[in-house]
Amino acid sequence: MSKGYSNLFTGTSGERVIKCQEIKTFQGGRSREEYSALARDPARGKKVDYKGKKERAIVLELERQGLIGRVIRDPQADKGADFIDTTTGQKWDIKSPVSHPKGHHSVRKGAFNVEKIMVNIKKEISRGHNVILDTRRLTSKDRLALQNAIKDEKLNDKIIWYDKKGAKK
């Protein structure tokens, strides 16, 4: 991890945490075409959409903070990851669970289910992918349940947490 970041600190559990800030212009020295390509997911027809832009913003922030190396989109559409760290070859998939889809607070289809998200996480890890968990749309209760499940399965070394407070490995 790079030294010299004024926003690097040790969390209450001893984990390394980097405060994230919205960086809309950081492109990591990429051309316009390369920057655009980061938002084009082959699994979604290589169209630039909201989800692709969100994923691009997340990986560029993690790259900028030194948590991952320079990334490209994984060109494999079927069973591919979202991104490949070109410095290590590690593939990364982003998961963005939501506690209450569409702002509803009642239990409904698509609502957070720790067992379901763990199945998805373990599937990615079994493929050799590490996982970036975007937990900005989880309640603190659901986030804690997910943290405990990850810890119980001993998957911490395969996860980067991305939330409102920062990113941490």
Question: Where do the protein language model's features map onto the residues?
Answer:
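Catalytic toxin/effector domains delivered as secreted proteins or via bacterial secretion systems
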Residues: 2-169
